[in-house]
A protein has these predicted regions:
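Short His-Asn-centered micro-motif
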Residues: 63-66, 82
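Long, charge-dense
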Residues: 26-35, 72-105
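Flexible, charged surface loops at secondary-structure boundaries
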Residues: 52-57, 74
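Structural motif
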Residues: 59-61
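C-terminal folded domains that constitute the principal catalytic or ligand-binding module
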Residues: 86-145
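Short, active-site-adjacent cap segments at secondary-structure transitions
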Residues: 68-70
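Conserved active-site and cofactor/substrate-binding residues in soluble primary-metabolism enzymes
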Residues: 2, 41, 45, 57, ...
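A glycine-rich, hydrophobic loop/mini-helix early in the fold
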Residues: 2-54
Length: 145
């Protein structure tokens, strides 16, 4: 299991990239953490180190893994989960942009109106989910070399 962080500017140009070392879950961890293991791995072992490694402070951190919302306590910026959805699944309390719905961490729900214009600007410049493909490709490249 790996994690990656790519900070892009409004045009989608990369400003900063980090990735974690591979994580290997032991049987003891599976037993001890039980149902909380995935939240722990994503929030503490992957998301936490990535957010702590950043040099620049983004307006918000987008993630395509909802479990990474649990990393919120490790960074100064709001953490927002993005997922593709159809028009029937959209919830009013989230930010809807085209086929995407953005859900801030509960700690950042009060900032939703402040975040909306930033995401609207970003989505007019790039396809919101595309940077996640670049993260995965960069991690794959690093693993193969």
């Amino acid at each position: 299991m790996f994690g990656g962080y790519l900070l892009v500017d409004i045009t989608g140009r990369p400003l900063e990239f980090h990735c974690t070392a591979p994580l290997r879950v032991t049987r003891a961890q599976e037993i001890l953490y039980g149902a909380t293991l995935q939240r722990y791995l994503h929030g503490e072992q992957i998301g936490g180190p990535l957010l702590k490694a950043t040099k620049l402070t983004p307006v918000a951190v987008l993630t395509d893994r909802e479990l990474l919302l649990h990393a919120r306590s490790h960074g100064a910026s709001p953490v927002v989960a993005i997922q593709e959805t159809d028009s029937q699944d959209k919830k009013e309390e989230f930010i809807s942009l085209g086929t995407f719905q953005l859900r801030p961490h509960e700690k950042d729900m009060s900032k939703i109106d402040q975040l909306r214009p930033h995401f609207e600007s970003l989505s007019s410049s790039i396809e919101l989910a595309e940077p996640f493909d670049r993260i995965r490709a960069a991690i794959d490249e690093a693993q193969n070399h």
